[in-house]
């Protein structure tokens, strides 16, 4: 495993336990109505809503006659998305992550929910997945590609394992699209993004226009994007409120160590960058050509 991948695996191995109070068995942001006040109970509902909104955006049908046969979650965390989709759609779900600790957690959650035969989890490399071409009816990833250096290869690998007609769904942080005439972000913007990436072991962030550019030459159709930045912003004040108390700080430190504290420090920067229009939270979807 490459040094960068090992760092990502260790980051999640060390910090995963710190976030269960907010997210349960999920490790991604929640989807809120803009301007609402988030609470811990609401945050657990919001992470599930994020999955529903992403699948709805990709036109994944809940009709029993039209529903997908199976789904792959690339960067599956501790299995929350797979378990939710397996139960809701009554389909086979597979998750892949580079963190052995996350695989163990996901398998434990599956066993606790009686879903061992519906949801399976593999430890592996998202750039070289151990699945045959055209295997999955939905290929889903949320807040994983930010960790990947070769994002274009990551997307090609997602398309490879997607079946003809499959929905491909990417939900991720990124940055604003460049304005006409701009060749790159401003130096101070690059500095801000580097600070975020360094604290939470991200490789680099791209724009929704980059995703469209990488997808366009591939055998896909119906590419579309959405900006969901306003839908995640209500969580930031909740995290600050809970983390910047003695009880919250010590809990994060005990359960997640310095890795968890660095996430909180990064989120302070992320909140301002989102307010400034630099940081974006986006959804991208397309269909594998038949």
Swiss-Prot record:
S-adenosyl-L-methionine-dependent N-methyltransferase involved in the biosynthesis of biologically active monoterpenoid indole alkaloids (MIAs) natural products including vindoline. Catalyzes the conversion of picrinine to N-methylpicrinine (ervincine). Residues 161-170 are annotated as: SAM motif III. Belongs to the class I-like SAM-binding methyltransferase superfamily. gTMT family. Residues 134-142 are annotated as: SAM motif II. The gene is TMT4. It catalyses: picrinine + S-adenosyl-L-methionine = ervincine + S-adenosyl-L-homocysteine + H(+). GO terms for biological process: alkaloid metabolic process; methylation. Residues 71-80 are annotated as: SAM motif I. Homodimer. InterPro entries: Erg6_SMT_methyltransf, Methyltransf_11, MTs_g-TMT, SAM-dependent_MTases_sf. It is an enzyme of class 2 (transferase). A motif (Vacuolar targeting signal) lies at residues 133-139. Its main location: membrane. The keyword DNA repair does not apply. Its EC number is 2.1.1.-. GO terms for cellular component: plant-type vacuole membrane. Keywords: Alkaloid metabolism, Membrane, Methyltransferase, S-adenosyl-L-methionine, Transferase, Vacuole. CDD domains: AdoMet_MTases. This is Picrinine-N-methytransferase TMT4. Pathway: Alkaloid biosynthesis; vindoline biosynthesis. It comes from the Eukaryota. Pfam families: Methyltransf_11. It is found in: Vacuole membrane.
